[in-house]
Design a protein with these regions (language model features):
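Glycine/proline-centered hinge or cleavage motifs at structural transition points of membrane proteins
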Residues: 132-136
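Hydrophobic alpha-helical transmembrane segments of membrane proteins
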Residues: 1-127, 138-275
Length: 275
């Protein structure tokens, strides 16, 4: 296939345009350019898998570090609750109504925006100059492969956090409704998938960068700003686990379906270098 003929270190490396030399060096340090790295997959899955492996320091290791931090925090909280049992009741009360708070937490730990930026700087900025790479079939097939990778990367810390919250809820006295446990768990995963889809969809629909890796889309900045403001506002909301969890799961499913439809409908027209 065409992509294998041009899949060189230059095309899978950091942009060589007018971005700052310091930024280039920082990114390069986190990229593995070992030509021995390969993949057993085929087609667009091969292309994407090779990208992920070469950028494991930038993508996977970041998610793993966040996961270890979360494990550490959960362990410390469990230890405090064991040593000071009277904190359990208050902690339980907080957990029962603080699920909206974790919308902001999930926004902060999600690597979707960072992954999208890496995709452009270290791959798309070069590949988008090839006509075949802008063909609808190529764009949509590669989008599907990338979405799988982004969701997988972000689900690692999300799974750890979801498990930890269920554990803390249980050891602090639990809940009178057993359904709260799976709702709490799956709502955290739903948030993770939501942000993974959200950042990648924005990248494909509003592709903000030009050939010099400069952001040229005001709409992209506004969309990210509104996302931040919405998540920040969630810090003030107090709603029971069952109510907010169900709303979160349903909203995430609906949003993802609509977003994926928009990508399939419009990305072939919008995914190109900005002038």
């Amino acid at each position: 296939m065409k992509y294998k003929l041009i899949l060189t270190n230059d095309n899978m490396n950091v942009a060589s345009y007018n971005t700052s030399q310091l930024s280039k060096e920082n990114v390069l340090k986190r990229i593995d350019v070992d030509t021995k790295i390969t993949s057993q997959k085929h087609g667009y899955a091969y292309f994407n898998d090779l990208f992920v492996k070469r950028h494991s320091n930038l993508l996977l290791k970041s998610a793993k570090k966040i996961s270890f931090v979360i494990i550490g925090i959960i362990f410390v909280m469990a230890l405090i609750l064991y040593l000071i049992p009277e904190f359990a009741t208050k902690t339980n009360q907080i957990l029962m109504v603080m699920l909206p708070y974790f919308v902001f937490i999930m926004y902060c730990i999600n690597r979707g925006q960072e992954v999208a930026q890496a995709m452009f700087m270290n791959c798309d900025h070069s590949m988008l100059t090839y006509g075949f790479y802008r063909e609808p079939k190529v764009i949509l097939n590669l989008f599907k492969e990338r979405l799988k990778s982004v969701i997988f990367i972000n689900l690692l810390p999300a799974f750890v956090l979801a498990t930890g919250l269920v554990f803390l809820l249980f050891i602090t006295g639990g809940t009178t409704q057993w359904i709260d446990y799976p709702i709490l768990f799956f709502s955290i995963l739903a948030m993770s998938i939501f942000f993974s889809v959200h950042h990648l969809v924005l990248y494909y629909l509003l592709q903000p960068y030009n050939a010099n890796s400069e952001t040229k889309s005001g709409t992209y900045g506004i969309a990210n700003g509104l996302t931040y403001l919405f998540c920040y506002y969630m810090l003030k909301i107090r709603i029971p686990i069952f109510t907010f969890g169900c709303l979160t799961i349903l909203f995430s499913i609906l949003y993802c379906l609509i977003s994926l439809f928009l990508v399939y409908r419009y990305a072939p027209k919008t995914f190109h270098l900005k002038n």
